[in-house]
């Protein structure tokens, strides 16, 4: 461990400071496709009984009308966060009739792209903007890739913890600047070490053969309808996913918040010729994309982790970051575990907390030389062949065996897990470390290996396996309904969201959509750091 990490742990471990670690916030967003009992994409509209996707803060849609997104509140205890996620699932199942929630990250067999419905958010200007943005995503990347689902894990330290750490360190800026500086340092370490999460929690080693739409690939045939890689952990996070020439040169610098926001601001304001050639409207005058820039909006940039700040109404993410600094990080590289009803377990959450906290507290030099490309290469190697015996990664420009480096990282994370246990009066973080060490020692214990083992044991391809797991989870949720009070609470939220959308559409100022989009685009150009 570095001297800095030791000093920070000692400070946080003092009796008067330990309670700060109980105030970390945890939020989870889980995406999942709605499918028919025959494992086909459900092309029905977003169920009105779930509320309005535009205004319901717990149940919305992601890219497609068929792609649900469940969002928990940010809570101090991950037990409560996961309980909230479980209840949202149970509410959803009470309104889905015979449809199922698809259990893995990689999608079910998909129809032709023209039959994949884009999420619809009503007739308000902001609703139409969200719809046109998704039309642009389809134009730029295709609809198929947008149907991949994942888990996003939001984590923050309390501001008082950052203020405490700042007191003992030589930092020239104010408390807000130090907090942003520290979150960006966290992200640099996450870039260095996130390959470990893919080994431990990657759960997408196989996919439906039709997903590739005839594109060339290096996958192997598992059966007539399934492609896979024998040692893969997460094909979802491999180069089968986002492949964008426009974004190829967009590598936001994580040296500081200013350079990060500047790079994204440039991307949302810089035309990209292939998009310029397409234009923003089709021959019928219909919008096809919000603009012809490298990115339509900043969220189009695909990354494994994002610095975030809760936005005010009408505020863009970059505006919030520039105005008030980084508030939390959003971990975006987690696969859905198809063996778990909600896709994530408490044991996994405990480890992620310790891992992210390690990234926050450990020394984090700026990414220099080949370190940035090595981080990307390590990540790609692990998602495609992380379980390959003897796999080497690059650490400090020298080869190191994955198992050795992973074990070394767990040893460094252990004191943080111990401190979290001490703060919360539990031993679950240390137990989670032991579970992960067992996966490092025995690759068959990883979710990716277990997916392939289950497929082989049942003589199933990807779709049959996924449908079976989806049915198992549906049975669990349908036989564990919410209490009457809980059900009424969710129904009230859904009803309120429908009323809010209707009010928005009825009372919105008379601004035509073209003007609204122009103002939205101009808002990014007026920001100054």
From Swiss-Prot:
It is an enzyme of class 6 (ligase). It catalyses: L-cysteine + L-glutamate + ATP = gamma-L-glutamyl-L-cysteine + ADP + phosphate + H(+). One of its GO terms (cellular component) is cytosol. One of its GO terms (molecular function) is metal ion binding. Keywords: ATP-binding, Glutathione biosynthesis, Ligase, Nucleotide-binding. InterPro entries: Gln_synth/guanido_kin_cat_dom (IPR014746), Glu_cys_ligase (IPR007370), Glut_cys_ligase (IPR006334). Pathway: Sulfur metabolism; glutathione biosynthesis; glutathione from L-cysteine and L-glutamate: step 1/2. GO terms for biological process: glutathione biosynthetic process. Its EC number is 6.3.2.2. HAMAP family: Glu_cys_ligase. Belongs to the glutamate--cysteine ligase type 1 family. Type 1 subfamily. This is Glutamate--cysteine ligase. It comes from Pseudomonas syringae pv. tomato (strain ATCC BAA-871 / DC3000).
């Amino acid at each position: 461990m570095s001297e800095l990490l030791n000093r920070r742990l000692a400070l946080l471990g003092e009796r008067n400071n330990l309670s700060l670690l109980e105030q970390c916030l945890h939020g989870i967003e889980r995406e999942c496709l709605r499918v028919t009992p025959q494992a086909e994409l459900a092309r029905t509209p977003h169920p009105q009984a779930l509320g309005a996707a535009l205004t319901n803060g717990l149940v919305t849609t992601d890219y497609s009308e068929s792609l649900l997104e469940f969002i928990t509140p940010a809570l101090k205890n991950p037990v409560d966060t996961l309980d909230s996620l479980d209840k949202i699932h149970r509410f959803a199942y009470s309104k889905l009739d015979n449809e199922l929630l698809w259990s893995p990250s990689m999608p079910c067999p998909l129809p032709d792209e023209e039959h994949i419905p884009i999420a619809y958010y009503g007739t308000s200007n902001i609703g139409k903007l969200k719809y046109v943005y998704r039309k642009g995503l389809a134009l730029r990347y295709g609809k198929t890739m947008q149907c991949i689902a994942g888990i996003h894990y939001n984590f923050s330290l309390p501001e008082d913890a950052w203020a405490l750490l700042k007191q003992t360190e030589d930092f020239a800026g104010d408390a807000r600047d130090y907090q942003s500086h520290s979150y960006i340092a966290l992200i640099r370490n996450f870039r260095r070490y996130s390959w470990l999460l893919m080994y431990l929690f990657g759960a997408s080693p196989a996919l439906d053969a039709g997903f590739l739409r005839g594109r060339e690939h290096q996958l192997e045939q598992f059966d007539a309808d399934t492609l896979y890689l024998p040692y893969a952990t997460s094909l979802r996070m491999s180069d089968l996913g986002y492949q964008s020439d426009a974004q190829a040169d967009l590598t936001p610098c994580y040296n500081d918040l200013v350079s990060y926001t500047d790079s994204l601001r440039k991307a949302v304001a810089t035309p990209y010729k292939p998009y310029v050639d397409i234009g923003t409207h089709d021959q019928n005058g219909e919008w096809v994309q919000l603009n012809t820039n490298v990115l339509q909006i900043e969220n189009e940039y695909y990354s494994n982790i994002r610095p975030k700040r809760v936005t005010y109404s009408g505020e863009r993410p970059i505006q919030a970051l520039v105005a008030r600094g980084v508030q939390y990080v959003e971990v975006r590289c987690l696969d859905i575990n198809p063996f778990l009803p909600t896709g994530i377990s408490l044991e996994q959450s405990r480890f992620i907390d310790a891992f992210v906290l390690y990234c926050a507290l450990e020394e984090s030099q700026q990414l220099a030389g080949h370190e940035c490309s090595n981080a990307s290469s390590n990540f790609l190697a692990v998602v495609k062949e992380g379980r390959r015996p003897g796999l080497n990664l690059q650490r400090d420009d020298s080869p190191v065996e994955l198992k050795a480096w992973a074990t070394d990282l767990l040893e460094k994370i252990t004191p943080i897990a111990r401190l979290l246990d001490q703060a919360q009066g539990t031993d679950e973080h240390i137990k989670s470390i032991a579970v992960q060490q067992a996966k490092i020692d025995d690759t068959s214990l990883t979710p990716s290996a277990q997916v392939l083992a289950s497929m082989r044991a049942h003589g199933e391809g990807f779709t049959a396996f996924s449908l079976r797991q989806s049915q198992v989870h549906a049975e669990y949720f349908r036989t564990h309904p919410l209490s009457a009070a809980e059900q009424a609470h969710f129904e009230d939220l859904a009803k309120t969201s429908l009323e809010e959308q209707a009010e928005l559409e009825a009372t919105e100022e008379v601004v035509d959509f073209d003007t609204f989009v122009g103002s939205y685009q101009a808002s990014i150009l007026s920001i100054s750091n």
